[in-house]
């Protein structure tokens, strides 16, 4: 986690059997365990469930799950040990890796969430063009790009040696430690040191800490690029998705007098999107507000508040598989099968695409469906054509022609799988 203060988190006199330490251990262990199990289940569900494995959206869900899984295994575990012991146990080299992996996994997780929102919007906005637009190659290129960007903002600063301190800077740090006036160095955008924290009596064995001080300018740039811009795009995508869902729902309801159970689909979509955006903001916004403040003066924010914001960000990796998994009926079925250790019963559908769309509309009142849909092709004389091609018509009391694209969009939205399909 990018943070401007870790050197005075705990000292060598920490009581390892205090209620506070026990609480930290229990809560941290639960977050790590749920993160690992949940994200492993997501990956297994996608690769073992035929319906999920054939979807282009799987790449983005797997990217999110892998980022959260790596964050739990490589970052949270060692962060918890560091918090419990009060000092760094794993050496200077791994400290570099740990800090960089922290930034990379968090950035990749946020970017993946943003890409998922864009992908889902495209699915509903242009369902007929989606398969042609979102090819496997394009999906993999998007995933590769977001991971490369995440790597750049995390590891490159170390490779450029922005973190190295001169001997004069090291002497200044130790002088400040002795005088209890530790200040953040402004000489570099980054400053890293594996320092020796003195105990209360100043004579005890020094305890190393893994530190990562952040300059204010970098903190602002990182927060803007890796959180505020992706967050704005995600909110924009989900707002447009909600408006499309509302528009299509009202149109189909007015034309076909939907079954009463379909009357709740709009509220289900709104509830799902509210949970997604609300959870994301609740977990990440506090840290990205406090982090620039910490870079200016590490004493402005109480230590306890700062640590809470760090673990709130970690907690997002715990709830992601719950939200993005259980909001989809296919994932729920796959989770139940995996938890019960049941085998997959794969079936091959022989139903044509148009017939599948028609069958998906079985919730329309039967009396309005006098027969199967017919295709009206562009012969240059059809007054209902829009840009050529064919449209699928469903006989209704009002004889309204509904395009196949609109039908497919409503099929997606009617299943309440607003996030992933």
From Swiss-Prot:
Disulfide bonds join 95-210. The keyword Glycoprotein applies. One of its GO terms (biological process) is positive regulation of MAPK cascade. Keywords: Cell membrane, Disulfide bond, G-protein coupled receptor, Glycoprotein, Membrane, Receptor, Transducer, Transmembrane, Transmembrane helix. One of its GO terms (cellular component) is plasma membrane. Its main location: membrane. GO terms for molecular function: G protein-coupled receptor activity. Central nervous system. PROSITE patterns: G_PROTEIN_RECEP_F1_2 (PS50262). SMART domains: 7TM_GPCR_Srsx (SM01381). It is a multi-pass membrane protein. Glycans are attached at residue 11. Residues 1-21, 80-95, 161-213, 296-304 are extracellular. It holds the Pfam family 7tm_1. Residues 43-59, 119-138, 235-274, 326-421 are cytoplasmic. The chain crosses the membrane at residues 22-42, 60-79, 96-118, 139-160, 214-234, 275-295, 305-325. It is found in: Cell membrane. Belongs to the G-protein coupled receptor 1 family. PANTHER family: ADRENERGIC RECEPTOR-RELATED G-PROTEIN COUPLED RECEPTOR, OCTOPAMINE RECEPTOR BETA-3R. This is one of the several different receptors for 5-hydroxytryptamine (serotonin). 5-HT plays important roles in various behavioral and physiological processes in aplysia. These include feeding, locomotion, circadian rhythm, learning and memory, synaptic plasticity, and synaptic growth. This receptor is mediated by G proteins that stimulate phospholipase C. This is 5-hydroxytryptamine receptor 2. It comes from Aplysia californica. The gene is 5HTB2.
